[in-house]
Amino acid sequence: MSLQSAQYLRQAEVLKADMTDSKLGPAEVWTSRQALQDLYQKMLVTDLEYALDKKVEQDLWNHAFKNQITTLQGQAKNRANPNRSEVQANLSLFLEAASGFYTQLLQELCTVFNVDLPCRVKSSQLGIISNKQTHTSAIVKPQSSSCSYICQHCLVHLGDIARYRNQTSQAESYYRHAAQLVPSNGQPYNQLAILASSKGDHLTTIFYYCRSIAVKFPFPAASTNLQKALSKALESRDEVKTKWGVSDFIKAFIKFHGHVYLSKSLEKLSPLREKLEEQFKRLLFQKAFNSQQLVHVTVINLFQLHHLRDFSNETEQHTYSQDEQLCWTQLLALFMSFLGILCKCPLQNESQEESYNAYPLPAVKVSMDWLRLRPRVFQEAVVDERQYIWPWLISLLNSFHPHEEDLSSISATPLPEEFELQGFLALRPSFRNLDFSKGHQGITGDKEGQQRRIRQQRLISIGKWIADNQPRLIQCENEVGKLLFITEIPELILEDPSEAKENLILQETSVIESLAADGSPGLKSVLSTSRNLSNNCDTGEKPVVTFKENIKTREVNRDQGRSFPPKEVRRDYSKGITVTKNDGKKDNNKRKTETKKCTLEKLQETGKQNVAVQVKSQTELRKTPVSEARKTPVTQTPTQASNSQFIPIHHPGAFPPLPSRPGFPPPTYVIPPPVAFSMGSGYTFPAGVSVPGTFLQPTAHSPAGNQVQAGKQSHIPYSQQRPSGPGPMNQGPQQSQPPSQQPLTSLPAQPTAQSTSQLQVQALTQQQQSPTKAVPALGKSPPHHSGFQQYQQADASKQLWNPPQVQGPLGKIMPVKQPYYLQTQDPIKLFEPSLQPPVMQQQPLEKKMKPFPMEPYNHNPSEVKVPEFYWDSSYSMADNRSVMAQQANIDRRGKRSPGVFRPEQDPVPRMPFEKSLLEKPSELMSHSSSFLSLTGFSLNQERYPNNSMFNEVYGKNLTSSSKAELSPSMAPQETSLYSLFEGTPWSPSLPASSDHSTPASQSPHSSNPSSLPSSPPTHNHNSVPFSNFGPIGTPDNRDRRTADRWKTDKPAMGGFGIDYLSATSSSESSWHQASTPSGTWTGHGPSMEDSSAVLMESLKSIWSSSMMHPGPSALEQLLMQQKQKQQRGQGTMNPPH
């Protein structure tokens, strides 16, 4: 077989030469590139070992894809290039093709080598009936490690491609799947660090660079990248404030490690360490950190300790320089001090509920694991100087009520923090007896309680080990099966943490002062003081810091009765955008006096919230490209209702259930409110005004990132994609919901038409009262927005799940054009059938959908009935299908009457791509339905959101299970797919920046994947902390090749685009999309780029249907198709030319 492979290699060299031959035209180069891809794919499939020896996989990426991507990016970045928009379109198409190639290659590798990856989508889910392999006898069977490597390679490059397309949430999903597949390989961690860096989350950036280095196979570029990041931190000014916020602490913490890692200015270590210890204690007692941040801080310390001294062979004597000894001493002192404070923190809060007390315990567990592996550390002088740690540890262990059987009950089930640290060299021996293959499936029943108990048992076991080996520190007595830890060391009494409450007030009042100071880009601004301190008395929240990518879901509110998100205005200083609340003026006034209003009782209530301190700069400086919010709900509030979960990085149990894993519980869904509110003012922007993308960006996203946006398809030129059309869940400015908005899962699932009208009218009344309240957000629009006619989506034309509902004056409901096969109905009747179907439409499509806030519209919670459990079987797809079909047809036929859906606005030129993309609702439905099949979720799973294993990983049962919990005052927030510690985001959220919103060529992280972005990203990060991680086979909302490749001709509109799918795969998302176009369509006059948008949309369908192997004839097909459309008289469907 090697002879044939050698022949393939020779052919590949010829093709590579052709691709670089300047004499050949684009068509010849394209043909050579396609041939090279096919050739390398054959080699990888038939003789993988030989191909890997020859680095075929690297040549495939570099020559067939990366070089061309880099070339197109360079051309598109040149603003003087007259063909810039065409280059961006070509880049978009090429990235689409590259993603399709690697998806198909991964699928073929899994099939040929019979690799059953947790992230793999079975062929049956893709509509492939059989996988007959020809020439199977010619395939050389590779080693399993080689199979894992090549699959990880595909996943990493799929993540890179998604990152170039600014689909950061999808990129993160690919990287995490890759890291889970081979935890000992450092490359996926490096890529995750790049994503974190692009968002400005430096804690997560440093954490993942450390993870990328401290593995068996470190990624070479990670060390350089870490040095750059730490050097940039050292360049920032020193903090002079006496009382730090969490962002100040993290900034100083990173500087401390910069001094140690780079051995610079070591004289600053000791005073900086003392300040860190002091502020860490104060902030921890304020509950300002979340579990994830504490573990990341601990792991960074362990990485540095491991880096300074290799304990692999403790029998050898090593000599260390004076600087090395100084760094070691200061770092070990910091580590031990932090450990003592972590042990003391739960004891200081004995009145708190037990589950909350566990929030520092994961970091304690990680720290104790390391000490157990390094017994010589107990002899260090800095450890002896901190003997006050051991009485606190003893008190903590005794609070677990240890029994003798705890020492013998050995569980191989990994805890979430152990999943997070798979392959981490500093702790690797501690994890050798754990079984990572089952994910969290080893625990059934009360996962939260069992995991808490497992952690306690492991801590008790470590305590017993210390008692056996260091009796001078700890002794253990056995009293009739009960263990009692004792020590002769006196316990150090700390001051009452009431000072922390005072500090909280001071911290809140200083927030406004620090807003201006932290507005500059760079590490300083990124790590600026947490602006999202809950100034709102109602929330009872703590100030909290978050790192943008690191934290997807915010720390949950422990007190469900006080789950109001903080109400404040989020500003993007770099873009001049202010995202205002819907109840803006009232809440703006409240913000000025909230601190004064907070009583001591409220502060005590605040003390009960485990809040991840969220850096306000998350919204200010993250600069997420504007359209990601459509994928990710905007939930910036650190303490939302206790449905928040967060994301372990890589373990099989953390990924959405797939058909290949029937045992996985279904994911959690939050049913959106059946009534869509109009969110914006009634103001119509003039045609020449460029509206910031924040007004155009919907919040919700679908499972696994495959939300098919109404009015948005994949092949729109990047220059047209930033001001994207509304997503299926949103309308108007709500897409960038400020944290002040209340989740609205408490809306009745089937309200009467009357209540619907009331709520709508109430929303309209607010609009009319302040018709221009969103106008201050106009500020400056990013430069690349200027080419578009943007508008504010202020009315019901964006109501995607209830398109027929029009917002008119009270008692005035505009009639909707009826489908030809429906009898005429009273328009008010149209509301009633439309209320129920959208619930099921959204349920499967919006895993982490943020329900619409209710407080701004209905201030009397008693007016809204609490729904029955929204996963009730009454929401059967079969029950609603006919009504949804009517709804969809109504939508389609009513969508071209702007007067109906925009009664309060003058026609505004629509963006050209919206027009072209809404021409084929059936195509949208086809995409959506095929996407659902990719996710692998069955209808049963979609209907039972309460069973997700991710609910139960850490913390409370995050899915509300009673009517009371769904009341407006405690409306649960959506849950993330990946949950670790209760309420605290665990692994980096990398808050999905907007996919497709920035031209790939302009992305700050679109160049070399291993390079650290030297400057903050230029795109606008709206607060979209959630990320959607679907099965790897699941394309992002623009990866639609799978849908199109099954059909050449799109079904007619009446066919709903599901003619080729089975009933199971054509689940609710297809129906959801059927009703989408009416919500986003408004016919307006021609615009400059209409024709190009239509061309791109048509070319996309041709491209995709040809199995991602486009040839030079694609343009000819496109022209033919355009001519046929005009001849068929589809003038109303196409934008005017």
Curated annotation (Swiss-Prot):
Pfam families: EST1, EST1_DNA_bind. Residues 723-770, 999-1025, 1117-1131 have a biased composition (Low complexity). Residues 633-646, 696-722, 988-998, 1069-1081 have a biased composition (Polar residues). Residues 620-646, 696-794, 890-911, 988-1055, 1069-1089, 1104-1137 are annotated as: Disordered. Transmembrane segments: none annotated. Residues 620-631, 1036-1050 have a biased composition (Basic and acidic residues). The modification N-acetylserine is found at S2. The modification Phosphothreonine is found at T624. TPR repeats lie at residues 152-185, 187-219. GO terms for cellular component: cytoplasm; cytosol; nucleus; telomerase holoenzyme complex. GO terms for molecular function: protein phosphatase 2A binding; telomerase RNA binding; telomeric DNA binding. The modification Phosphoserine is found at S520, S781, S897. Keywords: Acetylation, Cytoplasm, Nonsense-mediated mRNA decay, Nucleus, Phosphoprotein, Repeat, TPR repeat. GO terms for biological process: mRNA export from nucleus; nuclear-transcribed mRNA catabolic process, nonsense-mediated decay; regulation of dephosphorylation. It comes from the Eukaryota. It is found in: Cytoplasm; Nucleus. InterPro entries: DNA/RNA-bd_Est1-type, Est1-like_N, Est1/Ebs1-like, TPR-like_helical_dom_sf. Changing K66E: Abolishes interaction with UPF1. SUPFAM superfamilies: TPR-like. Plays a role in nonsense-mediated mRNA decay. Recruits UPF1 to cytoplasmic mRNA decay bodies. Together with SMG5 is thought to provide a link to the mRNA degradation machinery involving exonucleolytic pathways, and to serve as an adapter for UPF1 to protein phosphatase 2A (PP2A), thereby triggering UPF1 dephosphorylation. Part of a complex that contains SMG5, SMG7, PPP2CA, a short isoform of UPF3A (isoform UPF3AS, but not isoform UPF3AL) and phosphorylated UPF1. Interacts with DHX34; the interaction is RNA-independent. This is Nonsense-mediated mRNA decay factor SMG7. It comes from Homo sapiens (Human). The lineage of its organism: Eukaryota, Metazoa, Chordata, Craniata, Vertebrata.
